[in-house]
């Protein structure tokens, strides 16, 4: 699902809202999540999951084409950890037991 499909689905479930208003709301939510992560904050949506930033240290990499060793700078990457309710629902809907993983 892409963002435009998400907006369309939300608008269909909420006929009292215009699609452009739903799009503005979705964009505002996503922008606030990005802004919080850029500040170094963690964003937790209870039952859904938590967004955070992980820092990867500098390391020595290798160019796969030439085999040459190249330095890779440290970087920050977004990280998402699913919430308990989401994990349980995904496992239940897929016929997998949450306790055993099978």
Swiss-Prot record:
Pfam families named in the record: Bac_DNA_binding
Alphabetical UniProt keywords: DNA recombination, DNA-binding, Transcription, Transcription regulation, Translation regulation
GO biological process, one term: regulation of DNA-templated transcription
InterPro entries: Hist_DNA-bd (IPR000119), Histone-like_DNA-bd_CS (IPR020816), IHF-like_DNA-bd_dom_sf (IPR010992), IHF_beta (IPR005685)
Gene Ontology molecular function: any one: structural constituent of chromatin
Function: This protein is one of the two subunits of integration host factor, a specific DNA-binding protein that functions in genetic recombination as well as in transcriptional and translational control.
Assembly description: Heterodimer of an alpha and a beta chain.
Protein name: Integration host factor subunit beta
